[in-house]
Design a protein with these regions (language model features):
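A carbohydrate-recognition surface predominantly in extracellular/luminal proteins
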Residues: 43, 100-122, 131, 139-149, ...
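Extracytoplasmic low-complexity segments
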Residues: 4-6, 17-91, 236, 281-294
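Extracellular, beta-strand-rich glycan-interacting domains
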Residues: 46-53, 113-122, 237, 256-287
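Flexible glycan-contacting loops in extracellular carbohydrate-active proteins
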Residues: 214-263
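Short, aromatic/His-centered strand-loop micro-motif at the edge of beta-sheets
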Residues: 162-189
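Glycan-recognition/cleft segments
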Residues: 131-165, 223
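Short tryptophan-centered beta-strand motifs in secreted/extracellular beta-sheet-rich domains
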Residues: 185-194, 203
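Short surface loop/edge beta-strand patches of beta-sandwich-type extracellular domains
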Residues: 29-39, 89-112, 174-180
């Protein structure tokens, strides 16, 4: 009987140990509900934490960090480190270069959302590019987020978003404006989206809607005008740059007004869908929760 009880006790102890170990693993594997990457995770296709050269990109099929150029540096950001033009000068070359392979996710995005923390002074020269993807239009590229230097004010930046749809007659599309929601010298969370179902380009700041514009595939024909619809970016794309115009770096359109981004960028994410206003607000809440410094 004692032997039988001893066996039962040993079994009970072993079971308890397994249960504890399992509980511990469950805790370790629990999803952090406050992580911004939990917003539409299945559609999150690229994530650039911009912590260092080794951890500039964390998620993104066929996206690899290539090099840091000019006055590019990794400095204190909203969450950990961030990319910055250490000279804070549009006239000083500064960029990060990422190579885009044949299977990169930007080639197949028919809709998209891009989010990033940005902080910049008023541009002191030209119109700087915060993010650019090459190919597409020879001047503007496939996808672009820039500031129009002439449209910025002391308290607000002129943010301009651009895309190039290869499948439509009217290919180059943009949405840009100056707004106090795009603050100077202060971090704000910028979201740029395109929705193929509505043909709308939209800009948000700190989780709130700022502006939108319906885009068209071509001119009106017989009283009807087709929306831009499904997006197909140029499959010839090969590079994504943070902080500089792609054509300044490859020399194809090295115009003087295409200046370097003078500020900082952190936590860039791309989804292959247009997030809803509610999801964008939720994303901002999670971003703030995870922020080290704002």
């Amino acid at each position: 009987m004692k032997k039988y009880l001893s066996i039962l006790s040993a079994v009970a102890v072993a079971a308890a140990m397994v249960a504890c170990e399992k509980d511990g693993n469950d805790d370790a594997n629990k999803v952090d509900v406050n992580d911004p990457s939990t917003v539409q995770t299945e559609h999150l296709v690229a994530y650039f934490p911009l912590e260092s050269e080794a951890k500039a990109v964390e998620l993104g099929k066929d996206i690899t960090f290539s090099k840091k150029g000019g006055s590019a540096a990794f400095v204190e950001g909203v969450r950990g480190k961030a990319y910055a033009n250490s000279a804070a000068d549009c006239k000083v070359f500064s960029y990060l270069d990422f190579k885009l392979g044949a299977n990169n996710p930007f080639k197949t995005m028919s809709s998209f959302t891009m989010s990033a923390w940005v902080k910049s002074p008023v541009p002191n020269d030209g119109s700087p590019a915060m993010l650019s993807i090459n190919a597409g239009d020879g001047g503007m590229g496939s996808l672009l987020v820039m500031y129009e230097g002439w449209g910025c004010n002391t308290d607000s930046l002129y943010v301009k978003s651009y895309l190039f749809n290869t499948r439509t007659e009217w290919k180059g599309q943009d949405l840009g404006l100056s707004n106090v929601a795009f603050t100077t010298d202060k971090w704000f969370h910028l979201v740029y989206s395109y929705n193929e179902a509505t043909s709308m380009m939209t800009l948000y700041s700190n989780g709130q809607f700022v502006a939108e514009s319906g885009r068209w595939a071509g001119p009106e024909v017989n009283g009807k005008q087709e929306g831009l619809g499904k997006l197909i970016l140029d499959p010839a794309m090969s590079n994504l740059y943070i902080g500089a115009w792609w054509n300044n770096l490859d020399g194809t359109h090295a115009d003087a007004w295409r200046s370097s981004y003078p500020g900082s960028v952190d936590e860039i994410r791309f989804w292959d869908i247009a997030l809803t206003p509610e999801e964008i607000e939720d994303l901002y809440t999670k971003e703030v929760t995870k922020a080290d410094k704002l």
